[in-house]
Structures are given as C-alpha cells and as structure tokens.
C-alpha cells in the first residue's frame, strides 16, 4: 500500500511540474492581436497618401493652384469637382495663341437662366512660394466653360470700335477672349459680375486688367503683365480649368497664371 501511495504522489508531482511548465511558456508567447489591431497604423498611412496627391494628376478634392483665390470665405459644402491644366507653362506670343474649345448647347439652360456661360466673378491672388512663383487672375463662370483664346498683343483694342484700351505701366498685354460667353443680364442693362478686384491690381507680374468687350457672345479682357523692363520678357503663362462648388454656386473657373520669376 505504501508503494502505491508513493507512485500516486510521484505521478501527481510530475503532472504539477508539466502544468507549471505550460503556464510559463504561455506567459512568454505574445497573444494574437485582435482583428483590426493594426488599423490605426494603416489608417495613418492611408491618410498620408491622400494628403499628398500627385501634382501631375490632381484629385477632384485636392486644393490646386486654380482654387487658391476664392472671392469669399469658404463655406460648408465648398469643394473642387475637377481640375486640369489646359495650358502648361509656355509663351502664347503674337501669332501663336492658345485656344481652348468647349462645346455647349445654346441655350445652355432654359429661361429664365442665361443662355450662355455667364461671368459671375473675377478673383486675383499672388503665389510667391510656388515653383515657379506666379500671379493669378481667375474668371469664374456659371453654366459651363466657354471657349477662349489667350495671346500676347502689342495693344489692347476694344471690340467693335477698335479704339485703344489703356493699360498704363505694364510691360506686356495678354488678351483673353471668351467665346460663347457673356457678362451682362438678359436685358443688357447690368453686369453679372458680382465680385472683382480693382482694375489696378499692382502685383509683380499681374499689374492690372481691363474689359475690352461684351457683345454677341464674345467677352474680352486685357491683362497687364509686369512692370516695363529694359528688354521684352517673354512671360510664361499657365491656364487651369477648375469646376467647383463655391459659396453654394456651381462655378467653372478659368485661371490665368503668370510666371512672376522675372520680378522677384
């Protein structure tokens, strides 16, 4: 009987030893993380990727150079729907204009809406920290993008009369002609432009601007470029097209950007 009790005691001691060993090993082994345990790190990586979209292909919600001179404080619901570079940095000199064509039905909307894309506001802004630095004048239309031409001219002439339109103190003149567009009410008695900077802007590259015509679907502006210099500078131009919701309005923005490197 004593021998049997000794065997049982030994067996019990071996079992307790094995149990203690298993508990020790379990304590040294890391537990399996719960599902989603690494979601915070993954989310941070995704947020970083979304915060730095490629400049070559701006996303529909990214802030782009064509969206940086809003004519009023941002509101809830403001967003960029799409943006693209219509003309990359180049010099649209005399005889080599840049032309953008947009096909719109006429009328573009049923009455009482305007039959053509209508200029609602003009904005201006400086961007000295960009590469290259630039000044910008943006034309904000309702209804759609009009077609347009951009070209440097020796003199700004008024549509119809052909009389010179003064733009004093500028080194060059960039003419912008919007086709299939208007900036007046249906009865022709008032302007549709609700917000615009003073004509004498006074930036380094963008010195001033002036209207040159608004008749039969042709809307013209002259942009004064740079202070007079000893030599004629071929100021490079870039054009952005941005479709956006701004202050509750659906706008189509044509942003004219002027390289201000020469006037730094």
Walk through the language-model features, giving the residues of each:
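Bacterial N-terminal signal peptides that target proteins for export
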Residues: 3-18
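Intrinsic disorder/low-complexity segments enriched in polar/small residues
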Residues: 8-9, 41, 71, 242
């Amino acid at each position: 009987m004593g021998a049997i009790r000794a065997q049982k005691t030994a067996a019990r001691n071996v079992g307790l030893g094995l149990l203690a060993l298993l508990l020790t090993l379990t304590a040294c082994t890391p537990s399996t993380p719960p599902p989603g345990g690494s979601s915070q790190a993954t989310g941070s990586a995704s947020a970083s990727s979304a915060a730095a979209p490629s400049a070559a292909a701006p996303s529909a919600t990214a802030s782009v150079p064509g969206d940086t001179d809003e004519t009023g404080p941002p509101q809830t619901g403001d967003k960029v729907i799409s943006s693209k570079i219509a003309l990359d940095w180049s010099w649209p000199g005399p005889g080599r204009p840049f032309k953008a064509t947009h096909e719109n039905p006429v009328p573009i909307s049923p009455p009482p809406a305007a039959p053509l894309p209508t200029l609602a506001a003009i904005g201006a802004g400086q961007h000295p920290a960009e590469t290259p630095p630039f000044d910008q004048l943006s034309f904000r239309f309702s209804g759609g993008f009009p077609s347009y031409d951009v070209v440097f001219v020796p003199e700004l002439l008024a549509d119809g009369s052909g009389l010179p339109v003064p733009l004093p103190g500028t080194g060059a003149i960039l003419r912008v002609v919007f086709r299939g567009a208007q900036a007046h009410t249906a009865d022709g008695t008032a302007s549709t432009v609700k917000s615009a900077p003073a004509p004498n802007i006074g930036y380094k590259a963008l010195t001033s601007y002036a209207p040159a015509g608004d008749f039969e679907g042709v809307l013209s502006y002259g942009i004064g470029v740079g202070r007079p210099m000893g030599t004629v500078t071929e100021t490079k131009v870039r054009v952005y097209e941005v479709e956006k919701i701004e202050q509750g309005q659906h706008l189509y923005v044509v942003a004219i950007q002027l390289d201000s490197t020469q006037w730094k």
